Amino acid sequence: MAGRLTEAGRAYTLLEASNRIADSWERHYDRLHLHTIKRYSALPYRPFPASYPTYVAKADLLRYYHDYAATYRIRPRFGQRVIRAVHETGRWRITTQRGDQFAAKQLVVATGFNRVPHRPSWPGTADFRGVVAHSRTYQNPEPFLGRPTLVIGMGNTGAEIALDLSEADVPTYLSVRGPVNIVPRDFRGRPVQQTARLVRRLPHWLGDWIGNRVQAAAIGDLSAYGIHTPRESPARQLRERARTPVIDLGTVAAIRAGRIRVVPDVDRFLAAGVQLADGFHLDVSAVVLATGYRTGLADFLEAPDALSGEGIPRTAIARRGLYFVGFDAFASGLLDSIYRDSERVVRAILSAQT
C-alpha cells in the first residue's frame, strides 16, 4: 500500500505496532522460504532480483523489504499499536496504545490474518512440567534437541516445524485432528502455484478433478499413517472456505519414513506428557502449538458490519472510507492477493478524492 500511495503522490500516515520494518517476517522461523514463487510474491513496481531463488529465503526477503522501504521512502511511525478505530463525524478517529490520536477520511487496515496467536486450552495444562510454546515464537530446533516434542496442528506452519524438528533428530510427533488436504509444492518440475492459476480458469468441476488427480499422484494415501484426505478438493477448500491446503516440503516423506509420528488430537495435558483422544499417554517434554491465529480486528475496529462472524473482512472496499488489504486468499497465494487488493484499494482511494 505504501509503495503504491507514494507512486501515486498521495500523502499517508503509516502506523506500525512494532519497532522495525517487516517485523512479522523477522519473527518467522529460520528455515522459512516462501511457498509461492517469486514472480507472484513481489511488491508493486519492483520484482525480486534475478539472483534470488524461485522460492525466496527469509534473509533475501527481509533484504528486499528493507530495500523497498528505502526506495519508496516508507517511514512508518513505529511503536504505534492501534487500540481503537471508530468513525465519527465523517472521519476515522484512531487511538494508539501510546495515547496518540490520528484522524483521517480514509482508513486502510493491513494487519493481516496472523495478528493474534490462537492458543486453545486443555485440561491439565497447568500441571504439565514441560514447555508449551506457540509456533509464533519458534525459530529453530535448538531449544528442543533431545526433548520429545509434540506439534499440535497440521497446517503449513505445523507441517514445516515438524519437518524442521525431525531433520535435527528431535523425536517428533504431529497431532492431526481431522482430514487434511496436502499438495506438493512442485509437480513434475512445475510449481503447483502456476498450475493453480491456470486451473482456476476452468469450470470448477474440472479444476477440482485435476487437483484431486495431482494430489493422488504426488501425495498418495496416507491413511495408514493417521492422515486422511477430505472429500473436498484442495481448490474447493480454498475457494469456498478460504483455507489454504498444506504445501508439502518434505513432511510427507518424513512421515512415511517414521521420522515424524502422526497422533490423534490431544484430550488433556498430564504432568509428563499428554493424553490423546484415543486414550494413549504420549510422553513428551515440549509442545509447539501450531494452532493458527485470529485477525483480532474486532479488538480495536468499531465496524462490525464490515466483518464476518469469524472476524474476517467481508470485502476489501467497505463503507465510509474503510479498506482492507491482506485478508483474501487467491489460488495464487496471499502475497499475490495483497498485490491485487492494494491495487484495487489505491484506485478506490484516488477516485474518492476526485
Where are these regions (language model features)?
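Flavin (primarily FAD) cofactor-binding/catalytic cores of flavoenzymes
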Residues: 1-24, 53-156, 160-354
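Redox-cofactor-proximal catalytic regions of oxidoreductases
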Residues: 20-47, 75
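A short acidic, helix-capping loop that chelates divalent metal ions and anchors anionic groups
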Residues: 47-53
